[in-house]
Amino acid sequence: MVVGAFPMAKLLYLGIRQVSKPLANRIKEAARRSEFFKTYICLPPAQLYHWVEMRTKMRIMGFRGTVIKPLNEEAAAELGAELLGEATIFIVGGGCLVLEYWRHQAQQRHKEEEQRAAWNALRDEVGHLALALEALQAQVQAAPPQGALEELRTELQEVRAQLCNPGRSASHAVPASKK
């Protein structure tokens, strides 16, 4: 069962975005009913939006200097409530994007730190291996060559033979390896 690969955060963000639409509808209803919301939150942005929209349309059609009448209070309240609802959905969606970006950045940072730690561990191990190699090379250099060891063995056998057979000379001694 693959639990770690399941995109739980993305599913959570999708759920939040789905909940934002009913939330926006509730905010719109509250804005329509409340005088405070109508007067101070819905009407000014709605009138500004209406003024910019009408002015842009008039300029596109070639009319200059025409006076734009403001919306009546009911239409402005309706437009303001719609703008507030859309802004709520947009803010929730943007917030989800920002949170996903931060989460992704944190994952990337964590991944880079793990890679950096792995590289450092490999560097340390290579350093230890280099020191061990140098020590082994020094031991090999300090050890007598193989030919010298063979000569020492033959001499040792000759000395043993002389000690065991005091009457025989060193030239007649038979090495122990040939017996």
Curated annotation (Swiss-Prot):
One GO cellular component term noted in the UniProt record for this chain: mitochondrion
Q: What does the UniProt record report as the effect of altering residue 15 to R in this chain?
A: Found in a family with foveal hypoplasia; uncertain significance
Q: What tissues has this protein been observed in?
A: Ubiquitous. Most prominent expression in skeletal muscle and kidney.
Q: Report the superkingdom from the record.
A: Eukaryota
Gene Ontology biological process terms from the UniProt entry: bone development; fat cell differentiation; mitochondrion organization; neuromuscular process; regulation of growth; regulation of lipid metabolic process; visual perception
What Pfam families does the annotation carry?
OPA3
Cellular localisation: Mitochondrion
Q: Which UniProt keywords apply?
A: Cataract, Coiled coil, Disease variant, Mitochondrion, Sensory transduction, Vision
Q: Which residues form a coiled coil?
A: 103-163
Q: Write down the InterPro entries for this protein, in alphabetical order.
A: OPA3-like
Q: Which family does it belong to?
A: Belongs to the OPA3 family.
Which disease is noted in the annotation? 3-methylglutaconic aciduria 3: An autosomal recessive metabolic disorder that causes a neuro-ophthalmologic syndrome consisting of early-onset bilateral optic atrophy, spasticity, extrapyramidal dysfunction and cognitive deficit. Urinary excretion of 3-methylglutaconic acid and 3-methylglutaric acid is increased. MGCA3 can be distinguished from MGCA1 by the absence of increase of 3-hydroxyisovaleric acid levels. Optic atrophy 3: A condition that features progressive visual loss in association with optic atrophy. Atrophy of the optic disk indicates a deficiency in the number of nerve fibers which arise in the retina and converge to form the optic disk, optic nerve, optic chiasm and optic tracts. OPA3 is associated with cataract and a neurologic disorder characterized by extrapyramidal signs and ataxia.
Function, as annotated, reads:
May play some role in mitochondrial processes.
Protein's recorded name: Optic atrophy 3 protein
- Tell me what organism the protein belongs to: Homo sapiens (Human)
